Amino acid sequence: MAEYKNAEGYADPTAFGAFCAIEKEEKALRAFRPIVYICSPYAGDVESNTAAARRYSRFAVEAGYIPIAPHLLFTRFLDDNKPKERDLGLFFGNAILSKCAEMWVFGDRISEGMEAEIKRATWKGHRIRYFSETCEEVTR
């Protein structure tokens, strides 16, 4: 809790107001963080694409969001090289998308899987935001 008086015991309303505003912002950040769906390439250069998806997820956290990157999660126990398991992973991702406030699409290349996810998000009426590989928002 911010103190109304300074170290010398005098009233300091300016500092008090500033500290109260900071405390309010910090409390608001703890109270609510929207969930965003991270959409980025996975297949191909899996190692590089995984590192990029982790970087994009970190960017979302630092921006005050809760990132969900299904291609980082489901590939831990589903084989992306097996069509049935890949389709199952995409199905799971679509289910999770329903719980997300927005979809964030990263990179300048849209893979087949990303295209399906974007179409689904569009169909569901989700807000879709596009970002470069360096996490700068771009228009499409």
Regions found by a protein language model. Name each.
Residues 1-140:
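Catalytic phosphate/metal-binding cores of nucleic-acid and nucleotide-processing enzymes, i.e., regions
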